[in-house]
Each structure stands twice: as C-alpha cells, then as structure tokens.
Amino acid sequence: MDDMQQLKIIIEKHSDGYVAYPVGINGVIVGQGDTYEQALTDVQSAIRFHLDTFGRDSLTVEEPVMEAFVAEASV
C-alpha cells in the first residue's frame, strides 16, 4: 500500500479466540486468530486483499470515524 491510510480496528476477545474488523468501512472485512496479534495481522491481510481486489476507492469512507466506544445497555 503506497498511500497508507490509518484505520480504526475493533478487536474482540471471545472464548475461542479473537475477532478483528475495521470501523466505518462498507463491506465485510474480518480477521481472526488465537491471539490479539494474530487477529490484527489477519485483518490487515484481509484489508490488503480487499484493496488489491476492489481498489482503494472501496475503502473510501464518507465520514471518517473520529472515535469508537464500547458501551453496555439494558434492553
């Protein structure tokens, strides 16, 4: 990737490993791994594959995510 773009990545810890995905990008880009680092590396690889397949315009976000929060709510 010549023109690097900073993306916010959510990494969730589950009982069977970690799942990672970028915030604010249309389409399904997911990484997974047994560790935090493996999930992050896997999602970075998935993003590169997405770019190679669909082009940089596929990552264009109309309004970049400034911050991401995790909250709990009773329903």
Locations of regions flagged by a protein language model:
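Glycine-centered flexibility motif
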Residues: 17, 31-33, 55
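Short aromatic-glycine-(Arg/Gly/Cys) micro-motifs in beta-strand/loop hairpins
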Residues: 11-27
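Short, charged, surface-exposed hinge/linker loops at domain edges
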Residues: 1-8, 37, 41-75
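A short, exposed loop/beta-hairpin motif centered on an aromatic-Gly-Thr core
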Residues: 27-37
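Intrinsic disorder/low-complexity segments, especially N-terminal tails and targeting/processing regions
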Residues: 12, 30-32, 63
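Intrinsically disordered, low-complexity N-terminal regions enriched in serine/proline/glycine
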Residues: 17-20, 35, 68
